[in-house]
A protein has these predicted regions:
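P-loop (Walker A) phosphate-binding loop of NTP-binding proteins
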Residues: 28
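Post-Walker A alpha-helix
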Residues: 36-37
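Short, conserved secondary-structure transition motifs
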Residues: 339-346, 379-390
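GTPase G-domain guanine-specificity segment
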Residues: 345-370
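Hydrophobic anchor at the beta1->P-loop junction of P-loop NTPases
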Residues: 23-25
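Short secondary-structure boundary/capping segments
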Residues: 40-45, 147-152, 303, 352-358, ...
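Switch- and interface-adjacent substructures of P-loop NTPase systems
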Residues: 4-13, 17, 43-332, 347, ...
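Conserved glycine(s) of the Walker
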Residues: 31-33
């Protein structure tokens, strides 16, 4: 007990003296969180192994003020260790493979030994150590955070309002089955389980169509909860306001309506709230990743769906400046970075447009954050660079193109990926033409080589530069 209290006290002191920095790497499914964390660790661990030319925009590395970086044991021994070595092995195979997507929570901690450059503490101690804590977790689980503010009826009505376009078409079969049950009847466990499975199948179909706003997120990535009654419920999207009120008055405790309500509340209070309290209340800085290219290949609704999902997430993070007292007792996010991933899937002249799309994606959330007066930045990166930009001469003209291994057929290709719109086109655009941004395979990582990237050094400078 005393050892536990001592550990917590030491962590409070370290946080207050800026010795510990906890970074939330946030993003929806397939946005590149695992690749981002793997690359960030790799770039840091390779500092001083070469001339640091891989990080020209990271001042502390370029000025050789970082003395050493090593991975150290994390504080919470109940959380699995981030599989950095496994991810490197995947990239080192022949042929190389992308690291596996996140299927559960994991954590890593880096100790960064550095030479102080300025600030009050440089007079007290020339050298310092910054402990960097980074968490990885499934993007699907993030989608459940908005449920913290919604009861069963509110949640169902929210999804009812969004039931249009592709969502409505894919949900039709499941909706027909739900409409056939009498919600005041005594609940049959087998029927509930089957309807919950049908709802889960609908969510999977949404994912395949490039849609991101799917709830509950754990239905498509349940982890240890697979098959548990806690995941055997579903929203009621066919009820009117008067029907809701009638069911609340008349439905008995063993009815379908009551059981669905209880299971939703259990899920919200025990699973979602526990996840939020354990991982999201003590972050200092936040990175929000978004793949803005892949949704463009599908439809305007796919992009708008991703936009809505991210806006919902902003409600559940604490933003504000970090002064000494709130660093100790009320940690808040004081820096926020919006990152468009897969910047290596387009040519460099299209990067401003990609960043412009990212700005449009988070505009509403950005306005909210600006009110809290914290530092924000927008950029585009490739955590693990899969292509090389080349210049192609054709018919007497030169233009930029990409060279890499295309994922669809595993062939080495040289192609022009096309233009990125600076703003999201109208819905009419997709009726006449469409975007076709290819996916690429990673290049093989040689032993001892740092992971090739685009602008990870700019990310490190923004997140860590003022602490080193």
């Amino acid at each position: 007990m005393l050892n536990h209290l001592q550990k917590e006290l030491n962590e409070l002191v370290n946080r207050g003296l800026d010795r510990t920095l906890r970074i939330a790497v946030t993003g929806l499914s397939r946005s590149g969180k695992t690749a981002f964390i793997t690359s960030l660790m790799n770039q840091m661990l390779h500092i001083n192994r070469v001339d640091n030319g891989h990080l020209p925009l990271f001042d502390a590395a370029r000025q050789h003020r970082i003395l050493a970086v090593q991975r150290v044991p994390q504080l919470d021994l109940s959380i699995p260790r981030f599989d950095y070595e496994g991810n490197l092995n995947a990239l080192s195979q022949d042929p190389p493979m992308w690291p596996q997507s996140t299927r559960g929570v994991s954590e890593t901690r880096l100790a960064i030994r550095y030479q102080r450059s300025d600030g009050l503490l440089r007079h007290l101690k020339e050298k310092g150590t910054l402990y960097l804590d980074i968490f990885d977790y499934p993007g699907e689980w993030l989608l459940d955070l908005p449920l913290l503010d919604l009861g069963f009826e509110e949640w169902s009505l929210e999804l009812q309002r969004q039931l249009n376009g592709t969502h409505a078409a894919l949900a039709q079969s499941w909706l027909t089955k739900v409409a056939k049950i009498q919600l005041t009847d005594t609940a049959d466990e087998d029927i509930l389980a089957q309807l919950a499975k049908d709802y889960t199948d609908y969510l999977w179909q949404c994912k395949k169509q490039g849609l991101h706003f799917i709830q509950p997120g754990r239905f498509v990535l349940p982890g240890e909860l697979e098959g548990a009654p806690a995941l055997q419920f579903f929203p009621l999207l066919h009820l009117s306001a008067s029907q809701w009120q009638q069911l609340k008055r008349e439905a008995k405790s063993e009815s379908y309506f009551a059981v669905l309500t209880k299971r939703y509340e259990y899920y919200r209070q025990h699973i979602v709230k526990g996840f939020y309290e354990n991982y999201f209340e003590t972050f200092d800085r936040q990175v929000i990743l978004a793949d803005c290219l892949t949704p463009l290949n599908h439809s305007r609704q796919a992009f708008s769906d991703m936009q809505q999902a991210l806006h919902q997430l902003f409600r559940n993070f604490h933003y504000g400046k970090r002064h000494l007292l709130n660093r100790l007792f009320s940690p808040k996010i004081d820096k926020l970075m919006f990152i468009a991933t897969k910047a290596d899937h387009i040519t460099t002249d299209q990067l401003p447009n990609l960043i412009g799309l990212m700005r449009q994606l988070v505009q509403e959330g950005g306005r909210y954050v600006e009110f809290a007066d914290i530092a924000t930045d927008y950029t585009a990166i490739a955590s693990i660079r899969a292509t090389q930009q080349v210049v192609v001469n054709q018919n007497g003209q030169s233009f930029k193109a990409l060279q890499g291994i295309r994922s669809s057929d595993k062939q080495k290709v040289t192609l022009y990926p096309g233009s990125v719109p600076g703003r999201l086109p109208s819905a009419d655009f997709w009726q006449n033409q469409k975007f076709e941004f290819d996916q690429f395979e990673p290049r093989r990582l040689e032993q001892g080589e740092n992971i090739p990237h685009l602008r990870m050094d700019a990310v490190l400078q923004f997140l860590l530069g003022d602490k080193l």
